[in-house]
Amino acid sequence: MVFDVEAVKMTDSGEQNKPEIEEIGNVASHTRQPEVISTMKPKGGVFDDEAVYKILKPSGQMEFQIEDNDVKPEASEQHGLFIKQGGLLFTMPIKDEDWKHAKEIYLMDNEVSVLPENPRCLNLSALFLPRNYKLRVIPPSFFDYMPTLQILNLSRTGIKSLPDSLFQLVSLERLFLNGCHRLMMLSPKVGDLEKLEVLDLEGAKIMNLPKEIKKLTNLICLEVSFYGYTGNGRRSMQSNAVVPCGVICSLSQLEELNIDVNPDDERWDTRVEDIVNEACNLKTLETFKFYFPRVELLRHIQWNSLSLSHFRFTVGHHVKRIMSRVPLDVEFELERWERCLKYINGVGVPRDIKNVLQHATAFFLDRHATVKKLSDFGTRNMKQIKCCVVGECNEVQMIIDTADAYGEDGISEIESESHDAERIVLGSLEYLYIYYMKSLRSIWEGPVPQNSLNLLKSLTLRTCPQLTTIFTQELLDNLCSLEELKVEDCPSIKSIVSCKIPAEHRTSYFLPNLKKISLHYMLGLVSISSGLHIAPKLEWLSFYNCPSLSNPLINEVSSHDLKKIKGERSWWEALEWSNGRPDYLDEIFVPIDIWDC
């Protein structure tokens, strides 16, 4: 049997947890008959309470997973009835009789705007109403007769407040209000929900937490977003503290604490040290999302006593941007990794940042004022880094300089390690995204230790006006895993390969797993690889505004596995061919859309 709810599965790939999102219900919406738009008794099986359980996403957020294979046919009679109408654009109110006998109700992704005034749901254990954006008001007595309700999901609805009857739900264990952008206040009566284990307010616009939160001693997950300003930029309903003193340390069972704040909120600056100190004394904390306006606050983290399997730290005071230069897909990439450090508007290379880097799997260096190389942070500190984003660091001239490996005693950091694995630089890195780097000239300077960057799968370079060198021969030898290369608005690049390859190697193919190349706004580009054979498995090519580029399909890239070529029609038709253009290439050519660039 298929249920209408998003299930998020976790699979383990090394250190990375990759979410597999299943839209359970797509199949059901095509197969079920109209009569199921009502309360119904399942044929051959019902939803099992144990099929809904807490799991941990890579970002640290609690989610619930509903598995079809957890449905137990023999449980039909004991579980009673349920309603499922997710994603059917259901707008009509459900009959009172249906509510009366339901055990679970799933009405997500609909256009529900009105709820019954006082439904009698004495057996209801789970109510899912997420993404009903037209739902603005919950009737005052709506929850009066739901004594067994354990899970309530009102995420991404238009509600502005919660009725008092909600805080009488003595059995409630999990309350989801994420993405409720109109919700700004949380009643002190929330402290009456003594059995509550999960409280998710991420994406709501809560002004402050009431001190009564400290009564929720069974809480294992707390997620909250604070926004200290109204839409017109003025402070509204400010209290002295976003989180009252003693609240966090009272929640001794917390395993997950995610706090998102407006960096302009001065209240956070005055309370942040106390909050981080309380959080770092929680013995059970495993997932921690936090904004540190000052680097020195990181010293409160005692890595020997904390067991953080997931963290997402943003460090450095900054103004929240209305428009970000970081594309959404890059933000999503950063979210994929379980331990992420964002360092914004930094100066120098603080030891506290280096300490966090040793535990991080993702690093975002944003608008650093003085650093000249990424390797200034220490290559040994970045052994676990799998995702790296570097942007708007105006002084950075190169990414890695192996000369930085030499310490004060003159012994190389690389040479000082006895084991081969210890000599590798960025050996775990899989994703590298570099953008708006006005002084960047090269990716790598100096010798390239064997297996350095050998796991890199995706490389993107955007708007680096002085960049002249991307790949040297040593780098080419190591990039055996590279699958995708994007270079955009780097006008000084003449070829992505900037080296002379010995004659005996010119017939060999480099970048053996490269499948996708995108070259846009490359005014100085003359050739892709200076005549070197690359990418024998290439499947996708995209060009735009590369006026000097000669035909790369003759002697540089393989066309055997090509599935698509994108470019300007005028450029394509002007390409010169020694024996005429093969017909099959015309079949896979697609004129590029300017919005693709």
Where do the protein language model's features map onto the residues?
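Surface-exposed helical/coil interface segments that assemble multiprotein signaling complexes
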Residues: 4, 11, 16, 48, ...
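Recurring C-terminal helix/loop segment of individual leucine-rich repeat
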Residues: 94, 113-120, 137-144, 154, ...
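Extended, non-catalytic interaction/assembly segments in eukaryotic proteins
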Residues: 348-350, 372, 404-407, 461, ...
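Leucine-rich repeat
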Residues: 99, 120-123, 132, 143-148, ...
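Homotypic signalosome interaction modules of apoptosis and innate immunity
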Residues: 1-69, 73, 578, 588-597
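Conserved "Asn-ladder"/turn position within leucine-rich repeats
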Residues: 110, 132-133, 157, 180-181, ...
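Conserved hydrophobic beta-strand positions in leucine-rich repeat
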Residues: 105, 127-129, 149-154, 172-177, ...
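Eukaryotic beta-rich interaction modules
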Residues: 85-88, 108-111, 269, 342-347, ...
